[in-house]
Amino acid sequence: MGKNDERFEFYFDCFVFFYDFCRRIKQRYDSMENTGKIFGISLGPGDPELITLKALKALNAVEVIFCPGTKSGEGRMKSRALDILRQLEVDETKIRLFQVPMSRDRQEALCAYDRVCGEVLELVRSGKSVGITAEGDACFYSSAHYMYGQLA
């Protein structure tokens, strides 16, 4: 094999490597293009008039909104977050209320979060944008806070 043949083989191998590298990046980019986004949306201290403009824009922009609630002693679902969303006139067809069991045994709540995370990931993988609401700040002791680790 001559020197020119060796160079050709070297450059050809480099070209194949670079082509394959670019193809893998494009595949990854294409798969990300169809991926939705997840937003933790803070609803503020309880008064709907105190929600930030950015949170309100996020509520209107997302396609699905997960909203935590609890069951009352009579077995009815209650959700302060849902009450706020209704006062803000958010499209109720986008809202998915989920139950967070209030118990000293946190395992029940963690199981509920696992179920919701599965739904969220399925929606995001199908290209939907999803919001998870929280009374107060979504980063502190909220349902969104507990789910961030699983969704990351």
What are these regions (language model features)?
Residues 4-5, 19, 29:
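Acidic/polar hotspots within intrinsically disordered regions
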Residues 13, 29-31:
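Compositionally biased, intrinsically disordered low-complexity segments enriched
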Residues 32-48, 53-56, 60-152:
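Class I S-adenosyl-L-methionine
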